[in-house]
Structures are given as structure tokens and as C-alpha cells.
Swiss-Prot record:
InterPro entries xrefs: Cyt_P450, Cyt_P450_CS, Cyt_P450_E_grp-I, Cyt_P450_sf
Catalytic reaction list: 3-epi-6-deoxocathasterone + reduced [NADPH--hemoprotein reductase] + O2 = 6-deoxotyphasterol + oxidized [NADPH--hemoprotein reductase] + H2O + H(+); (22S,24R)-22-hydroxy-5alpha-ergostan-3-one + reduced [NADPH--hemoprotein reductase] + O2 = 3-dehydro-6-deoxoteasterone + oxidized [NADPH--hemoprotein reductase] + H2O + H(+)
One biological process term in Gene Ontology: leaf development
Pathway linked to the protein: Plant hormone biosynthesis; brassinosteroid biosynthesis
Protein's organism: Arabidopsis thaliana
Protein name in UniProt: 3-epi-6-deoxocathasterone 23-monooxygenase CYP90D1
Segments traversing the membrane: 7-27
UniProt GO cellular component terms: endoplasmic reticulum membrane
Amino acid sequence: MDTSSSLLFFSFFFFIIIVIFNKINGLRSSPASKKKLNDHHVTSQSHGPKFPHGSLGWPVIGETIEFVSSAYSDRPESFMDKRRLMYGRVFKSHIFGTATIVSTDAEVNRAVLQSDSTAFVPFYPKTVRELMGKSSILLINGSLHRRFHGLVGSFLKSPLLKAQIVRDMHKFLSESMDLWSEDQPVLLQDVSKTVAFKVLAKALISVEKGEDLEELKREFENFISGLMSLPINFPGTQLHRSLQAKKNMVKQVERIIEGKIRKTKNKEEDDVIAKDVVDVLLKDSSEHLTHNLIANNMIDMMIPGHDSVPVLITLAVKFLSDSPAALNLLTEENMKLKSLKELTGEPLYWNDYLSLPFTQKVITETLRMGNVIIGVMRKAMKDVEIKGYVIPKGWCFLAYLRSVHLDKLYYESPYKFNPWRWQERDMNTSSFSPFGGGQRLCPGLDLARLETSVFLHHLVTRFRWIAEEDTIINFPTVHMKNKLPIWIKRI
């Protein structure tokens, strides 16, 4: 059995265990819910909104095996495409132990993602819920979520932070790129991950270097390893190790918070300029924003620095490496900006990077094709009717964004990397939602674009490179199989 077959077999075995475990713990539909399912089916046959067609698959495991098999292929959306042809763009299924309504319809997805918590709430696998905790920004609802999301979002969009991000990216990238060798490949995914984590750690809690950063990174690696682990918590299991790692990180962040409070005791609160997200949250008077809640959420917010941003950067370089015309135009655009700034003696500001039109089109097209976030899950809190479909109370809803982004209904030649398609196209449509949507739209989306813009600028203005052949792995998270090795030559 070759390596890929072994991996696939292990994945099947792994997820079947998860499904069986969920079944034992009552996550599988109860007899009462089965009756309700049948009631919905009968109702939809006679009048009113229809219950989506589809199949619940095999007993216990549902359609999980076929879903995982497709997820590991080079066309993960094939599972969805097959059912879309059979049942339509919205259909029922049963994956990972949960009865699920799956949508590949852009309008239905937008309607669900824009709904409030009376209709839909976030839904995550049991392991993720345990690791995040009930007070995570990913799970909380109502006024506390709006308050937290608003405070964090405003700061992440602020010109002050964007200027800091540019300075930090320049510093960390220069330190890294100065050490790159022409005699051995640079693992681009690892480099981008290291830089992005440093940038985010400073933006969140002002940890920049030294033992604090190294300790945080070590514990974070242990923590994030448990996100796709078995939901079994006892000494020796990955979930137990991950929970312990998070406890250690929370204690570290709480010490940082206590230090900040001590340093500002003798100052007027209004005179304290927020340098990071913790400062912003500490300045808020809400009694609900406890130090423990803040510390826990700082850990959760580090996940994009480990996954989303580095993957976006890596995929952009991968797609550009395979598209010489796009790479040449992006390089020309960035070299012109560099020459202009050298001529005037001005530094590069954050809005300089975001004003590069073709660079932004490349990032947008990378988001569409790369699908860093392949889908978003919600749970229906009541029966909800959308576009003629009824989504039953208690059912999971999966907005499968990847299928929408690669649908020829919305995009001509959807599997072709074509940044020029965005010259006349509006990004603010239901058919483009790489960061989710609604009240839970990722607050760091502007920073993701900015960090990618800065990275690409430094790369194309300092180096020429050849990328080795590599494969995009789409499950359980998007990443490059070999970390995208590139052979560089300095300009």
C-alpha cells in the first residue's frame, strides 16, 4: 500500500471512530429527530417550502467516507458536485455524525451567514468546541459577541495598526530573507507561517521576541494539533495535551495582562494609547470582558496566523509561479512602486501596498481558487425557510464556499487562475465570500490582504525564483504537501 493510500485508509478509520464516538454520546439524530425529519419530508411533498432532497447514507457513518475520500482528492468539491446534479444546489446529507443541510447556492449561503443568533448559531466539531471554550469569540452570541467583535474589528482596521503591521512585516521579512540561501530550497510555507505568527503575536499581545515568544509558539503548536483530534480527553491523548497547552498559554497571557495593568496604574486611562488588541479590550468598561475571557480569545485569534494568512501567501506564490504572465505584471507593478519610493525618499505606507491594483487582483483570485476557508458551519435554532427550502431546527448547515467559488455558473473557466477576471467584476457579491460573512465576517480580512501584499512585494523586488512541483492538500486544512520549496536567486 503506497503512502497516499495508507493516509486515506487512516483518515477513513480516524473519522469513522469520531462518528461512532459521536453516536455513543448522543450526537446522532435521536428517534424523535428522525420522526421530525420524516414529518418535514411529508410536509414538503404536499405544500409550502420543501425539505432538501438527498441521502443520509449508511447507518452511523452516513456519507462520511465518500466525503473524506473526495476531500483528499484534487477536486474536493466532487462530493458536492455529484449531489448537486442529483438533488440540486441545496441537499441533505449526514457527515461526521451529524445530519446536515449542505448548500452550494450563493444566495442561500449569504442568507444563512447574515442571519442572527435567533436563527443560526456557530457549529463546530466537539473537539474544537472543547478547545475553544464557551467564551470563545467563535462560539459566543448576542451582545457580548457584537461588543467583542466590534472592538477587535475596529482596532484591526485602524491605520495605526496597519502602519505597525507594515513595519513589523518589513523587519521580520528582512531578517528572514537575509538568511535565505541560493544553494538550498526555501520552504515558503514555513517562512510565511513564522513571519505571520510573529506579526500576529505582537498585534494581539505585544510579544515580539525572546523566550516569551518561543514558549508561546511551542505551546501553540501543541494546542493547534488537537483541533482535528479524537474527542477523547484523558492523559496521553492529543486532546488532553492540547487542552493543557492552552491552559499554559492562557496563564502566560494573563501574566502579560497583569503586567500591562501595573504599568498603567499611575496614568490616566485616556492617555494610554492602545498598542495591541489586549490594550483595546482592557480599556473597555464591560464587566463581561474578564481577564480570563480576553486571554482565552487571544489564543483563539492566533489560529489565522498559523493557517489562513500563511496559506494565502503560499498559494499566491504557487499560482504566480505557474502563471508567468501574471507574475511578470505583478513584478513590474511592484518594481515601479519601489523605484518611485526610492526616488522620493519616502517609506512604503500600508495604503501604498493596498493601492497596487494588479497585486490586489492576484490576491482576490488566490482567495477564490485557493479557498483557504472551504466552508462555514451553522446550527439551526428553529425551522428556517430560505429560497423555498426549509432548514429544520437542530440540523447542521454547511455553506460550502469552495463549490460556489469554482462554479461555472458564477465564473468562466473557474479552474483557471485568471486575476484579470476581477478588472470589471464586483467582489461584493454573494458568489464571493472567502472570509465568511454577516456579523461573523472575519475581522482580520484587511490585515490578511495587507500581509500578503507586503510579502509579495518583498519577494518579487528582491528575488527571482523557481518553484518545485508541489501539491495542494485540501483536507483537513488547506496546505502544500511539501511546503512549497522554491529555489531563489537574488536580484
